[in-house]
Amino acid sequence: MSDLILGIGEYGVSKTPGSMVKTYALGSCVAVTMYEPNLKIAGMVHVALPESKLNTAKGEQCPGYFADLGVPLLFKEMVRLGCHARGRGLVVKMLGGAAVMAGNDTFNIGKRNILAVKKILWKLGMGPVAEDVGANYSRTVSLHVDTGLVNVSCPGRGQWQI
């Protein structure tokens, strides 16, 4: 079993039985998970900022860093591996977008990331079936390839599923 570990700005897809797609310490970042239950294809992107126009060079170098590039690329990769081209059957979830800067969330990055992801999913004709967003704590997220279950954990808060 070989898990796929994603860092900030990375996206990936797995069909490996018994494995997980995982990312650590989502603060204001947002993870979008996509799962195709019949084909058992699991994908995730770890988005840091809403729009690539903030830094076009970074967008070219690391497109998953931005919601407007990363979410469509994740979907494209899911389709490449056999998912329906219009997203039919995909189970989409989103997590993160926390306000982690105690008392100083001037830029509202978490909220802006959440809204950007929802807008992009809407443009793709999709929406999340479950969310665990906002609040003021970081999350570690694991998407199980065999089941599509999304486990969330946070130090001091325990573990849960969405």
Swiss-Prot record:
It comes from Syntrophotalea carbinolica (strain DSM 2380 / NBRC 103641 / GraBd1) (Pelobacter carbinolicus). Keywords: Chemotaxis, Hydrolase. Belongs to the CheD family. PANTHER family: CHEMORECEPTOR GLUTAMINE DEAMIDASE CHED-RELATED. CDD domains: CheD (cd16352). InterPro entries: CheD-like_sf, Chemorcpt_Glu_NH3ase_CheD, Cytotoxic_necrot_fac-like_cat. Its EC number is 3.5.1.44. GO terms for biological process: chemotaxis. GO terms for molecular function: protein-glutamine glutaminase activity. This is Probable chemoreceptor glutamine deamidase CheD. It catalyses: L-glutaminyl-[protein] + H2O = L-glutamyl-[protein] + NH4(+). It comes from the Bacteria. SUPFAM superfamilies: CNF1/YfiH-like putative cysteine hydrolases. Signal peptide: none annotated. Coiled coil: none annotated. Probably deamidates glutamine residues to glutamate on methyl-accepting chemotaxis receptors (MCPs), playing an important role in chemotaxis.
